[in-house]
Amino acid sequence: MAYRTNAVAAINVGFFEIAGSDDGRPGLTLMIDSKLFSLRKQLQSLLIIDQGNIQITKASAKILVVIGDKSVIPNQVHYFSNLKDITFYNDVWASTTLTSYTNKEILIDQNRSNFIVTAISKHGDNQIPQKGFILSFPQATSLPVVNINDSVKLILEFIDKDGKLINLSNTASIVTGIPLLVQNGKNVVDNPKQDDPAHARTALGVCNDGTIVIVVVEHIYKQHVKDLKLVQVRSILRQEKEINVDKLIIPEALKILEKHLVNYTVIGLTKTELADYMLTWI
C-alpha cells in the first residue's frame, strides 16, 4: 500500500493478509475522516488526529444504530458474517455485503443530512449504498420491527479509561495497533505482561515538544514445514547431495526439512526491551 501510494512514511496498523490480498483489512480500529473501516470495542491504545491536534490515549468504543424507536448494536464491523453476530457494513467493505443468502439485511442510505431506511431485504449479499450502510442479521436473529423511510441515527463513541466521552469532530481519524512505549522520556509500557515472547515491534514515542518518534524493529522467523510450497521443498531436498529425491520416502523427507526449518523461531524484542531501546532515541 505504501509503495503504491508513494507514501513518505508508513505505519503498521494491524493489517493482515486475507484471501491472497496484499492489502488485507485492518484487524483493530481504523477510521479516516470519520469513515469507519474497522472497529475494536475493547480498551485499546489509540492515535487520534482531529483538526490538527494529535492525541494518544486508551479508549474503548461503542457503536449503536437507532432506527425509529428501536436500537440495534452491531457485534462486529466489516467481518464476514457468522451465525450469531449482527454485522455493520459500509461501502469501504465491498460493493455488496458478501453475506450468506440466508441473512436478512436493513439497507440505510443518506437523505440530505439524515439517514433513513431505504429497503428491508429477506436475503443477504445486498449492494451497499455509497453514502449509507447495511445492518446484516444472521438467519437465527430476528429483524427489529422497522419500516421504509424510518429515520436512522448512527452513534459511534470512544470512551477514555476514566469513562469520559472523547469529543471528536466529523473529520477525525483514529488508528490502533501501535503500542505506546515511551512518553516524556519515561518507559510507559502499554501492557502489564512483561514476559511476552520476543517478536517484531512497531512503537511510538512522544517528546515534550510534541515530536513523535516511530521505531520499527524487524524480526526474523523461519517457516513452519506445513507452510512450505512444493517448489521450496524440492529446492531444500536437492541441497542434500547424497539423497536420491525420486526414491525418498515421506518420513525421511520430513527429517531433512526439519533440519532446515524451526517452528516459528523468532528473533526480536519484548515490549520492555523496545521501550528501553526507544529511550536512546528521545
Swiss-Prot record:
InterPro entries: NAGPA
Listed Pfam families: NAGPA
Domain of life: Bacteria
Name of the protein this chain belongs to: Uncharacterized protein RC0079
Native source organism of the sequence: Rickettsia conorii (strain ATCC VR-613 / Malish 7)
